[in-house]
Amino acid sequence: MVRFISLNISVTALLLFSFRTHLTTAASTNTCVVAKDSSDDAITIAKAFEDCKTDGTVVFSKNTTYSLKSVLELSGLQNVNVDLAGTIELPARNTSYSTTSAFIHFEGSNINLYDALDHTAPPTILVSANDSSFGSFRIVNAPRAHMRIKNSNNILVHNVTFHTASSNICYLPKNTDALQITQSSNIVFKDSYLTVGDDCTAINGGVTNVTVSNIICNGGHGFSVGSLGKGGSTDVVRQVRVRDSTCNGCENGVRIKTWPGGQGSVSDVNYNNIILNNVDNPILVTTHYCDPNVIEYCNSNDTISLTISDVHFKDITGSVSALGNPVVNINCSSLTPCSDFTLSGVDITRVTTTSNNVCENLNGSSDISVCS
């Protein structure tokens, strides 16, 4: 087991923890307190992990900031507890890190972490693990996505605070998704507070059985499934539950987005008891998603995309912004229409400029009251 306690990361650039072994639980027999270094704290951090890499505890002292000038790669750890009571300050922006897989990479099994403007940057934390939990930590001012779960099973993320915002409208915190999930199953994300510049959740291809609950997200792009099917690729997502959560001032509220020309399916998706306050696009399902930063992928066959079915919106309340967008916008492809949708308890306060709801290429739309 690798156990992390009291993690407080002030993100300005790059840090990489790489755990490459499968780890088992054992009592700690040695404690190594990370010392400060006059030039680069990565040196003393590496030494502490080397000295306590088997059945040890590595301690980052409380009220201490550790400044890194280089990348850390920590491997060969067995049964290590990590008490991150201090703050890790990552290196200054450096484009040479743009191809790095993550700032912090946890790879292994039974990992437990507790109490704890570069748009080409990798995510801050990458999890590739099984039967692991990550909770009660903060990430502040991430340069890109805060956390990504990939090739994982049975992961719990809880009681986290992600805060990335900008006071300068010319430098918006783009691509700062809170939690990205891909090629994974049995994921729970709950009891967390987010301020981000992109998706509050991004549930991507190859994902099964995700539960998101009791999340407050501010200023983000909503609780999203996708994007999926980019460049004609095949993606499958099923069994998604998003409930008892809030989006404040978000661009989108609850959203499913697939690219034109994509293949695969989205099914068994439930949004339940969601509060959307001053949201531009409260309920949005589109098979015509386009990212202008990669416009070459926007020109595929717009009549087909992933099939989206068995999707249910229940008790979605709040208010729409003054931009004039519809409360409900379901816009599917003509040759792969959406089907088996229900919308009940939708109570979003409109403004005078709010457009009529859209339900295009949705089978059974005549039986859905918000579509008429």
UniProtKB/Swiss-Prot annotation:
- Ranges occupied by PbH1 repeats: 152-183, 184-205, 207-227, 237-258, 303-350
SUPFAM superfamilies xref list = Pectin lyase-like (SSF51126)
Compartments in which it is found: Secreted
Which residues act catalytically here?
A: 198, 221
Broadest EC class?
hydrolase
Look up keyword Zinc and say if it applies: no
The leader peptide range reads 1-26
Q: Name one GO cellular component term.
A: extracellular region
Task: State the UniProt keywords alphabetically.
Answer: Cell wall biogenesis/degradation, Disulfide bond, Glycoprotein, Glycosidase, Hydrolase, Repeat, Secreted, Signal
How activity varies with temperature is described as:
Optimum temperature is 30 degrees Celsius.
Q: Give the pH-dependence text from the record.
A: Optimum pH is 4.0.
What are the protein's GO molecular function terms? galacturan 1,4-alpha-galacturonidase activity; polygalacturonase activity; rhamnogalacturonan alpha-L-rhamnopyranosyl-(1->4)-alpha-D-galactopyranosyluronide lyase activity
Query: What are its GO biological-process terms?
Result: cell wall organization; pectin catabolic process
User: Where does this protein have coiled-coil stretches?
Assistant: none
Q: Does the keyword Secreted apply?
A: yes
Q: Which SMART domains match?
A: PbH1
Glycosylation positions in this chain: 8, 63, 94, 130, 159, 209, 301, 331, 363
Family assignment from sequence similarity: Belongs to the glycosyl hydrolase 28 family.
Mind telling me what this protein is named? Answer: Exopolygalacturonase rpg14
Q: Specify the taxonomic lineage.
A: Eukaryota, Fungi, Fungi incertae sedis, Mucoromycota, Mucoromycotina
